[in-house]
Amino acid sequence: MKTYRIGQIVPSSNTTMETEIPAMLQARYAEFPEERFTFHSSRMRMMHVNPEELKAMDIASDRCAVELSDARMSVMAYACLVAIMAQGDGYHRVSQARLQNTVKENGVEIPVLSSAGALVDTLKEFGYKKVSIITPYMKPLTKRVADYIEAEGIEVQDSISLEVSDNLEVGLLNPENLLEHVKRLNHDGVDAVILSACVQMPSLPAIQRAQDQIGKPVLSAAVWTVYQMLKNLGLETRVPNAGHILSGVKPQA
């Protein structure tokens, strides 16, 4: 039996990734009984999703990376999309390189991911060139997310903004409601649907059902982060009831 330490750098008011990522990885135990995972987090202060707090939070990510590397993680992920996307197109590359170097300077060689980078990498790996998205954000921030994705050469056909500004309230949204929201989303002709383009908006209970409902791959921030974590750990990318990309299928791109 081998134990993998999963590290997350999270906004202080977030709880969802620390719920959904353990749920997915522990759901693997029946199929992969030789695996065990432990879960560890370091927090960046953030209560409201605004430019000032996002910038301060991004700076704090360096401290968090050092703290997690002290405990010798197997892999770590910067689990916030908008903190990175708000800094400008392609910023996940800058952030990941900086955090990777910070960890290396602490004497640790481990993969350092970000949820923003994992989104871009996963869409490209699977050849998804057109998507539609659901976010909890106010419309200007949803546009920033869509623009970031489009700057990577992936078209965002449609988006729904739930317009919940309080980050704690986002974490309390009912994932079952996403099954109704997705009916309002224009997903004709898209390659995939992003059911939750936010690490704090719960979606895991709805992922597989939404995919079955619309007949297209359905992803979320937690799902694509787990996919990239498993890849970087050299493990099979399979999680039950977590959608197409975690079904063990190999990318076509």
Swiss-Prot record:
S-(2-succinyl)cysteine modifications at: 80
Active site: 80 (nucleophile), 198 (proton donor)
Gene that produces this protein: maiA
Effect of residue 80 to S: Loss of activity
Function (record text): Catalyzes cis-trans isomerization of the C2-C3 double bond in maleate to yield fumarate.
Keywords: Isomerase
Miscellaneous comment: Reaction is initiated by nucleophilic attack of cysteine at the double bond, yielding a covalent succinylcysteine-like intermediate.
The organism's place on the tree of life at top rank: Bacteria
EC number in record: 5.2.1.1
GO molecular function annotation: maleate isomerase activity
Top EC class of this enzyme: isomerase
Residues bound to substrate: 14, 80-82, 137, 167, 199-200
Keyword Isomerase: yes
Xref: InterPro entries: Iso_Racemase_Enz_sf, MaiA/AMDase, Maleate_isomerase
One Pfam family named in its UniProt record: Amdase
UniProt GO BP: protein homotetramerization
Protein family per UniProt: Belongs to the maleate isomerase family.
Subunit-structure text: Homodimer.
Annotated organism of origin: Alcaligenes faecalis
PANTHER family with a match to the protein in the record: BLR3294 PROTEIN
Lineage of origin: Bacteria, Pseudomonadati, Pseudomonadota, Betaproteobacteria, Burkholderiales
Record's protein name: Maleate isomerase
Reaction(s) the record says it catalyses: maleate = fumarate
